[in-house]
Regions:
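Active-site catalytic loop in hydrolytic enzyme cores
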Residues: 89-194, 198-208, 274-278
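A hydrophobic, small-residue-rich beta->alpha segment in the mid-to-C-terminal subdomain
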Residues: 2, 251-271
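Cys-nucleophile CN-hydrolase/nitrilase-fold catalytic domain and related Cys-dependent amidase chemistry
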Residues: 8-108, 112-116, 122-123, 188-212, ...
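Hydrophobic residues at beta-strand termini and immediately following loops
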Residues: 115, 150, 224, 252, ...
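Generic N-terminal amphipathic, Lys/Arg-enriched alpha-helix
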Residues: 1-7
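A short C-terminal boundary segment appended to hydrolase-like catalytic domains
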Residues: 267-301
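CN hydrolase (nitrilase-like) catalytic-core segments centered on the catalytic cysteine
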Residues: 59-82, 156, 162-259
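Short beta-strand-to-turn element immediately C-terminal to the catalytic PLP-Schiff-base lysine
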Residues: 104-106, 242-243, 262-263
Length: 301
């Protein structure tokens, strides 16, 4: 998906999403995956002292008046979709939570699941020396739920968001639940402020982590970018569909709204799950204790 500028309304963005839905349907797609924070610009690039001044970037309900046309048209066409957005979770006890989420919708229009982002990157406080902010840790809480999967679209489907894709635990936790299709939306600035030497490697790293996650868990991975120049910040494009073999079977070529399609044969997953990555036969969880017992590295004496 191409950039969403600050002045664009949700209604304008939803019209773009519906246009891509029509293109995908004409190409035979049964499931359309949209990127992280698809309905708005990537607002964590700005910092506001009063976080409630950013509430207009969040959705309180899904669907809502702006997104209902997408839900209606998808149901009419018999096409499911996965949509990323910011969720303002106002609870009856008066607490307010802010999540970065993806909602998976089946072909009949029913909501299958909503996933909350687990690995929140960036910083919590204003860093005025940056050319732009990446204040996700200010605007979003990390998920308390982790990585679940759902039976949908004739298989076992899981979700992840942006920075989640860089962590092998993301794929493995879902792999241990038999996942066959992982849906990932992302916004990735090409300029990485903490270490600009990584800028030139953004595309390489993007493919590396999704191809590795697919292969090592015998699953399809669909990674979808909101890329291009958005409010002066250039973000990675390179949406791709990765097979359980780790091979890229389709990839976007532009920084505009673009639709790619692949036939994802879920039976292909068994070629890896039942052989080299037969978890029950080959895994050694008794020696993996450090993965869950500690957070940071503990160096040897």
């Amino acid at each position: 998906m191409g950039p969403v500028q600050k002045e664009q309304t949700r209604e304008q963005v939803v019209a773009r999403l519906i246009s891509m839905l029509h293109q995908a349907h004409a190409m035979g797609a049964e499931l359309v995956v949209y990127p992280e924070l698809a309905l708005t610009t990537f607002f964590p690039r700005w910092f506001v002292d009063d976080i409630t001044q950013a509430d207009h970037w969040y959705e309180r309900n899904m669907p809502n008046a702006a997104t209902q046309p997408l839900f209606d048209e998808a149901k009419r066409l018999g096409v499911g979709f996965c949509l990323g957005y910011a969720h303002l979770d106002e609870r009856s006890d008066g607490t307010v939570h802010r999540w970065n989420v993806q909602t998976l919708v089946e072909r009949d229009g029913s909501i299958v699941a909503t996933y909350r982002k687990t690995h929140i990157p960036g910083h919590e406080h204003h860093e005025p020396d940056r050319p732009f902010q990446h204040a996700e840790r200010y605007y979003f809480e990390p998920s308390p739920d982790g990585f679940g999967v759902s039976c949908a679209f004739g298989g076992i489907v899981g979700m992840a968001i942006c920075n989640d894709r860089r962590w092998p635990e993301t794929y493995r936790v879902m792999g241990l639940q038999g996942v066959e299709l992982v849906l990932i939306g992302y916004n990735t600035p090409i300029h990485y402020v903490p270490d600009p030497s990584q800028d030139i490697l953004q595309g390489f790293h993007n493919a590396l982590v999704m191809q590795s996650g697919a292969y090592q868990n015998g699953t399809w991975v669909v990674g979808v970018a909101k890329g291009g120049v958005e409010e002066g910040v250039d973000s990675l494009c390179q949406s791709m569909i990765v097979a359980p073999s780790g091979q890229i079977v389709a990839q976007t070529l532009t920084s505009d709204d673009e639709v790619i399609v692949a036939r994802c044969d879920l039976d292909w997953c068994a070629k890896y799950k039942d052989t080299l990555f037969d978890f029950d036969k080959y895994r050694r969880p008794e020696v993996y204790g450090r993965i869950t017992s500690q957070r940071g590295a503990v160096l040897p004496d």
